[in-house]
Amino acid sequence: MAPIVETAKETNSDSSLYLDLMIKVLAGTVYEDPAHRENFSHRDSTYREEVRNEGRDWPANAHTMIGIKRLENIRQCVEDVIGNNVPGDLVETGVWRGGACILMRGILRAHDVRDRTVWVADSFQGIPDVGEDGYAGDRKMALHRRNSVLAVSEEEVRRNFRNYDLLDEQVRFLPGWFKDTLPTAPIDTLAVLRMDGDLYESTWDTLTNLYPKVSVGGYVIVDDYMMCPPCKDAVDEYRAKFDIADELITIDRDGVYWQRTR
C-alpha cells in the first residue's frame, strides 16, 4: 500500500503548526507530564520520552495515553480523507480522557471542515466486567480492575473539549456500552473509524455495527491490536469472516490501521 498522501496538511502552514503543538499538548510531552502512579510500563512515575512517544504509559494528566505516533497517525488519516474527499464522519470507540477525539475535531477546525461530525463513543464508566460467560481472553485481562484509572466521566471529557475551545455542534457523544449504543447510533457514513475498546467483545461490537459504514478510501485504526490479544482476535476473526484483505499497517508497537479498498 502506498504511503498516505498528506494533501490537506501541506496547504496551510498555520494549521500545521497548530496541529503540531496540539499533539504535543494532548500527549503531555510539551510539559513532560509524568506517568500515573498506577502506570504499567515502568516501576516509577517518571516521564520517559521514548515511552510516551509509543503510548506505553498512562499519563498522570495528559488527555490521551496513545502517544505521539498514534496521534500522528490520526492526523494523517483524517487529513487524507479531507484532501481526497472521502465522505463520512469520524468516530472513536473508547475515548478515555478524549484526546484522540479532540485532535480529530482540531483537524476539522484547522482545515475549516464544517460538514463532518466527530462521534465520541464510550461507556464513561470504564471497562466492563465481562463475567464468567464472557470471552476468555477478556476475563484473563480483567481490565475492569483498573477502572480507577480507566473510567473517565462524560463531563470530564466534555470539559477537556471545552478547554481547547472545541466543544460545539460538530461533536456528538454516544454514552453507554457499545452493545447497547452502536446498533442504533445515528451515524450514516464514516471516513475514519478508530477503535480503542481493548476487549474482544468491545472490538467485535464496534466492527459489526460500524465497519459497514466506513467509506471506500476511509480508514480503520485499531489502537491495541498488538497490546491486547482479545482485541487482535476480534479483528482477525472479523476480517477473515468478511474476506477483508486490505493490508494491516503497523503504527508503533501496539497500533495498526488499514484503508478500506472495497
From Swiss-Prot:
Catalytic activity as recorded in UniProt: desmethyldescarbamoylnovobiocin + S-adenosyl-L-methionine = descarbamoylnovobiocin + S-adenosyl-L-homocysteine + H(+)
InterPro entries assigned: SAM-dependent_MTases_sf, TylF_MeTrfase
Class of the enzyme per the UniProt entry, highest EC level: transferase
Amino-acid positions noted as binding S-adenosyl-L-methionine in the UniProt annotation, renumbered to this chain: 64-65, 92-96, 122-126, 178, 196-197, 202
Pfam families in the record: TylF
Active-site residues from the entry: 72
Cofactor dependency: Mg(2+)
Subunit relationships: Homodimer.
General function of this protein: S-adenosyl-L-methionine-dependent O-methyltransferase that methylates at 4-OH of the noviose moiety, the penultimate step in the novobiocin biosynthesis pathway. Novobiocin is an aminocoumarin family antibiotic that targets bacterial DNA gyrases.
Protein's UniProt name: Demethyldecarbamoylnovobiocin O-methyltransferase
Protein source organism: Streptomyces niveus
